[in-house]
Amino acid sequence: MNKEAAIMSGLKWLNSFEAARNMAISTKKLVLIFFHSPSCNGCKKTLEKTFTDQDVADLLEGDFACVKYTVTQDENMTACYNVEWTPTFVITDSEGRELERWVGYLPPDEFITQVHLSEGLAEMHAKRFKAAEAAFEWIIDHKPDSEAAPEARYYMGVALYKDTGDARHLERTWETMNKRYPGNNWTKKAAAWS
């Protein structure tokens, strides 16, 4: 077994998008596609440091049907998702429609926060607002000082509004953000709701 195979064995990766699609349909999970390259240092760190973290593995296996592709070997999938840099993480629905993506290595703690943010955005794009709210709320409750927190708070307001149609959620979001994250770009965007 090569080093990559040994590292990747900690996570339960599915062997094809079709397998991920079937799992996503039967479990109502989203699909997470990990694009990597053998020559990419960020990919190596993701494999060796991030994916070996038990909290990362538990989150990914609990919330997603995970599949991985090597960009130099799986050129059709790489082209289909317009992967220009690695590592790239793409969240799709069960039909393969891209809902969200992010690029680049993150250590385990920041990776978990990014997963929650991207999962919330993906759920919102899929119009599953309660699931989006839960993902954003995780960041607000567990990582309130993270770089992702203002964006999560902003989109929590959007998800609540889209879920209920109640514009007061937007105004309360602005008020909370203005107190908690003054001067942040996401707070400036929320100022339209004041």
Regions found by a protein language model. Name each.
Residues 7-56:
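Local sequence-structure signature of Cys/Sec-based thiol-disulfide redox active-site neighborhoods
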Residues 54, 97, 101-107, 139-149, ...:
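Short solvent-exposed coil/turn linkers within tandem alpha-helical repeat scaffolds
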Residues 17-26, 52-118:
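Thioredoxin-like thiol-disulfide oxidoreductase module
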Residues 79, 112-146, 180:
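Alpha-helical segment of the N-proximal tetratricopeptide repeat
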Residues 132, 169-170:
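Single-residue signature of alpha-solenoid repeat helices
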Residues 129, 166-167:
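TPR-repeat structural position
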